[in-house]
Amino acid sequence: MKFSALLPVFFLLLVVGDEVQAIAKTALKVLPQLFKRSVVRKREIEEAFDLHQRDLDFDKLLSQLDFN
């Protein structure tokens, strides 16, 4: 009787173990790509802001030099 009760538990452990392994493999492939994309996006945003800030600083400098 114990064997018949343990058999479904053992089968479920195999199925769940395979699912966990598949999820872990997928996560190991997907997560680094997500982080890479976010870092790239962050750099792009920072570069765009820096260019915009430089333009603003240059315009401010020109307005200060304008004596009219």
From Swiss-Prot:
It is found in: Secreted. Residues 1-22 form the signal peptide. The keyword Cell membrane does not apply. One of its GO terms (cellular component) is extracellular region. The keyword Metal-binding does not apply. Keywords: Antimicrobial, Cleavage on pair of basic residues, Secreted, Signal. Disulfide bonds: none annotated. Transmembrane segments: none annotated. Expressed by the venom gland. Probable antimicrobial peptide. Shows low inhibitory activity against herpes simplex virus type 1 (HSV-1). This is Antimicrobial peptide Eval162. It comes from Euscorpiops validus (Scorpion).
